[in-house]
């Protein structure tokens, strides 16, 4: 398998810029690691070259594209890719941050700390205007995911079951606004007569290499949890349908192109798919998951 080296892409990248059209890419995979791997490769090979607001002097521009990624079987094994840049315990802590809100208490914009978590925006959306104004805004929080469960329990085929994160009164003023913008779900009946929960997520911007895998790992787990909640509500099994991930700016930063080449691409060249992925029931993965949970429990004890 041959990959274009980043140093060989100069002519093509400049042509992409002159074209004036940001590349639009579509990839699909049966499993999460397969889809993520294909998406990073697609941006590497076909992404355009664009500057960002975070570039330092002398750094290469980012590779970037608008990406639609389809995961046909979100919970089929293997669930993990060995080349995602992070520790298993960090992946588990991030999952808990998204689905359980274990870091919602870190939202303290008045102290210069976090302005949001995805869990807080999805499960308790509170309108705010002032970064220095403290935690609560003028209106009661909106439990958007509860609405999503209730709506689909009543009308499985509804097109209104969605939750948003963007807060136009606050986010444009911040240095780190949410990347995730919207979650949309709908139930569909398969030819087997079973109900399947389909989920779409929409992102304004995403680091394809360093963030996307962890994002999708957590969001597909949220999909699983929503399916379970709907099933309990309607008294009928709800299985997982496909997961679709749409990103306006799906990018690989120029500052670490060599890391992608040396770590990610090399693993694809040198290892089989089985060798570069893990099943979630692997003992190494389970140990890492437990370490992540233990670290969260320790955080809670230290907070009192």
Regions found by a protein language model. Name each.
Residues 2-304:
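Terminal, non-catalytic protein-protein interaction segments that mediate quaternary/complex assembly
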